[in-house]
């Protein structure tokens, strides 16, 4: 089944894309302040049966199938209502991007996609609006479920260690080593201070092999401290214990053993995938709509802030401290610090990824409220050291997200007013 056909099936199950003419005014289910029409259920049933016939898939009997469809419609309606409640809006730009991606994934142009949808009896305008609705529901679900997820640092560390062992098995490191050896009667704190001084010089660019020739008492001192290429399993244990996916050029130490203090340098790495990310330092002002402050009022107030900043009447930081309703950043002149854009909700992420440095955005809305944001700086950061922790976090997040989605949907359903209207009530 093409991707758009899968979406079309969801559309028929969630929104009366094609409605049977006589059934339009027949309410089948009341869901809070919304309704599901019998025509929605009938259309979804016909579509599912037709697709099952084409694919040779067996379906349950009519009563069970009807119950499953009604349950799906109720959950989808509740998710749409949640999106409306927290103010999720999908603008035309994001909608167009999503539909272009659907067309690309099906190797179609937009015109070809539109024609294919029309051949199934659905207008392109209806298709667009249903995709918009499903995007909003998905975004609301993600935002609300994300708040319920708690991942402990120990969970991340434990999984990252397992992943690291699997990945590190084939990685080879070229290691440089400097050993400062204990001698009888020597002040160990003085030796440690010397080791720290050497590390500072190395980090400032001093040549490692020269330092090893000069100071090291280790077994490879006459080779400039060069131990050559080794996998972790081939290294001395005191080396292997310090190697945790660091990248080329990393200086490690000083660390202590029974014979003295050690300094390592990873001269080169083979087989380790490096990870570079862009971090953005931005600042923002957040206003949250209330019964007193409307959406339009929040926009007007933020536009007035922009005018005052440009006129030199106030600084961004002053206004953030005085007015922003994000207490964590307001105290820092609105600054959020260097973060990867993926940490932010989609609308905020889009702004910090696309705004030129030093430019203040127009007011925009997220699930948190109305914002203006300014990008202060961008930087490329090598995250190879933390790549395994990031991967471990994503795995744990996805596991817990899938578990929490089910629980959230059950709670949503349990807390809703749902009334299934029988034939007698409709006829009476």
UniProtKB/Swiss-Prot annotation:
Catalytic activity: [protein]-peptidylproline (omega=180) = [protein]-peptidylproline (omega=0)
Pfam families cross-referenced by the UniProt entry: Rotamase_3 (PF13616), SurA_N (PF09312)
One BP annotation, GO: Gram-negative-bacterium-type cell outer membrane assembly
Name of this chain's protein: Chaperone SurA
Domain PpiC: 170-268, 277-377
Keyword Chaperone found: yes
Keyword tags: Chaperone, Isomerase, Periplasm, Repeat, Rotamase, Signal
Residues annotated as signal peptide: 1-19
Protein function: Chaperone involved in the correct folding and assembly of outer membrane proteins. Recognizes specific patterns of aromatic residues and the orientation of their side chains, which are found more frequently in integral outer membrane proteins. May act in both early periplasmic and late outer membrane-associated steps of protein maturation.
Subcellular location: Periplasm
SUPFAM superfamilies: FKBP-like, Triger factor/SurA peptide-binding domain-like
One GO MF term: peptidyl-prolyl cis-trans isomerase activity
Domain notes: The PPIase activity resides only in the second parvulin domain. The N-terminal region and the C-terminal tail are necessary and sufficient for the chaperone activity of SurA. The PPIase activity is dispensable for SurA to function as a chaperone. The N-terminal region and the C-terminal tail are also required for porin recognition.
Gene Ontology, cellular component aspect: outer membrane-bounded periplasmic space
Entry's EC annotation: 5.2.1.8
Broad EC category: isomerase
């Amino acid at each position: 089944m093409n991707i758009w056909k899968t979406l079309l099936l969801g559309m028929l199950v969630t929104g009366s894309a094609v409605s049977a003419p006589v059934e339009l005014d027949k309410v089948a289910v009341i869901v809070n302040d919304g309704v599901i029409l019998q025509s929605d259920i009938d259309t979804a049933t016909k579509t599912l049966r037709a697709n099952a016939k084409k694919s040779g898939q067996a379906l349950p009997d009519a009563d069970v199938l009807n119950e499953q469809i009604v349950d799906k419609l109720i959950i989808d309606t509740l998710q749409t209502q949640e999106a409306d409640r927290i103010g999720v809006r999908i603008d035309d730009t994001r909608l167009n991007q999503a539909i272009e991606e659907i067309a690309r994934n099906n190797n179609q142009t937009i015109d070809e996609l539109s024609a294919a949808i029309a051949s199934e009896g659905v207008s392109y305008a209806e298709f667009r609006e249903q995709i918009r609705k499903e995007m909003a529901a998905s975004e609301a679900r993600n935002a609300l479920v994300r708040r319920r997820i708690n991942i402990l640092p120990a969970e991340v560390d434990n999984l990252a260690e397992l992943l690291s062992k699997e990945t590190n098995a084939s990685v080879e490191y070229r290691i440089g080593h400097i050993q400062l050896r204990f001698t009888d009667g020597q002040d160990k704190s003085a030796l440690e201070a010397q080791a720290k001084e050497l590390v500072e010089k190395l980090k400032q660019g001093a040549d490692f092999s020269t330092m090893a020739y000069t100071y090291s008492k280790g077994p490879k001192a006459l080779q400039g401290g060069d131990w050559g290429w080794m996998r972790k399993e081939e290294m001395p244990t005191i080396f292997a214990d310090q190697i945790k996916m660091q990248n080329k050029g990393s200086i490690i130490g000083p660390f202590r053993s029974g014979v003295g203090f050690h300094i390592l340098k990873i001269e080169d790495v083979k087989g380790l995938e490096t990870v570079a990310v862009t971090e953005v330092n931005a600042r923002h002002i957040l206003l949250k709509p209330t019964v007193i402050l409307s959406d339009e009022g929040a926009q007007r107030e933020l536009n007035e802030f922009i005018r005052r900043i440009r006129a030199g009447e106030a600084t961004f930081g002053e206004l953030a401290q005085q007015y922003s309703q994000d207490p964590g950043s307001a105290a820092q002149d609105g600054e959020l610090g260097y973060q990867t854009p993926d940490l932010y909700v989609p609308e905020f992420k889009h702004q910090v990824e696309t705004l030129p440095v030093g430019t203040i955005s127009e007011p925009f809305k997220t699930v948190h409220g109305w914002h203006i944001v300014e990008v202060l700086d961008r930087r490329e950061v090598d995250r190879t050291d933390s790549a395994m922790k990031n991967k471990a976090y994503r795995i744990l997040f996805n596991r817990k997200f899938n578990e929490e989605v089910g629980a959230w949907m059950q709670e949503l359903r349990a807390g809703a007013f749902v009334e299934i209207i029988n034939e007698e009530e409709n006829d009476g």
